[in-house]
Structures are given as structure tokens and as C-alpha cells.
Amino acid sequence: MSSNASSEVDITETNKLTRVYSEEEKRAILQEFIDWASYRAEIGGMVVSDHYLGHGASGSGDWYANTENGEMQVQDIGQGIPGYDQFPIHLLGGVVFYTSIEELYGYDPRPGIESIAVGFHRLANPNMPVTRYLLGDDGIIYELKGTLTELGSFHGGYGLYEEDGSKAIDSSSDIFEVSKDTDAQERYMEILSKYN
């Protein structure tokens, strides 16, 4: 989901908004963003889901994403492996854009009820890209785009720390880049400004 807008979002040190957000604030921020993203998806002939991570039984380590600005803690398991303070960026929420195999546009709640093993494979058009947006507590949206084969699982693009603090052998080496979607970046900054 890239914008055709000619303006550029200034992603600099002044955009670093890092603070600890409550779970209630995270839900509110994500809801505002998903409301905006649903409309964007609908006019673009796509769907969007807020089911950005799903996994079965895993170790007691944290889930993370590699970004061009360092590792982002995607899910804090609460065991301190490696723990909140070890990550420079923390997730406030995330969305996944894809093209449905059905005539469905806008928000899609179905990924949240699909089985972990199925992922997006029964929902997404295999010939179209899947794009994940991660909303960082640094005020930046990070993006990873790939094929259904690459990102079709609910944990595609992420890594996991093992109980001993090492990275799981099947952790993704994908890098989430700073999104060039200027409309999304600007909307995210507007939303965050209400909480900072």
C-alpha cells in the first residue's frame, strides 16, 4: 500500500516518540489506525486485518521483527527473554493488507478465527502481494511486503527468542523497512499526537 502523495514524511530523530504505552492506549491507537486503513483498503480493492501475528505453542521468549532501525519487540511473553528493555522499538499494533479471493474489501475479521496452520492461505489471492505494517512506539510504520508463500503464515516475517536467549533457528531474517506510504505515516503521527 504505497501512497502516490508527493509529500515526504520526515523520519528523523525528532520523530522518536518512545514511551511506555498502556494496553488500553495501544488498542485505541490500533483501532483508529485500522478504521483509517479499512477505508484505504476498500478504495484500493484490498482487505486489511489487524491479525498481524498468530502462533501456536512456542517457547517462553519474545517475538520480534527485524527493522532497518533495530529489533522491534512484537510480543512480550513476560518472561524477560530478552525482555522489554532489550528492544529499541516496541510494537503498538499492526495490520496486514492483502487481496481477498472473494469479493471482499475493507476490514476483514476472518484471519482472527482461522486456524494457525492455515494462515492467510484460504483468504488471500496467491497471485497478489501481502503487506504487513507494524506501528512502532518510535512513531514510525515499518513495512514488509512479500508473496503469500513468504508471508502467508500468521508468524511470517517474525523471529522468536528461545528460552536460553538465542534466536530460534527458523526465525525470519526479513527486514521491515520504513514504509514509504506517506499517507499512512502522516495519519499514524496524527493518531500518536493525541497520546504524547
Predicted regions and their residues:
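Mature, Sec-exported extracytoplasmic domains of Gram-positive
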Residues: 3-196
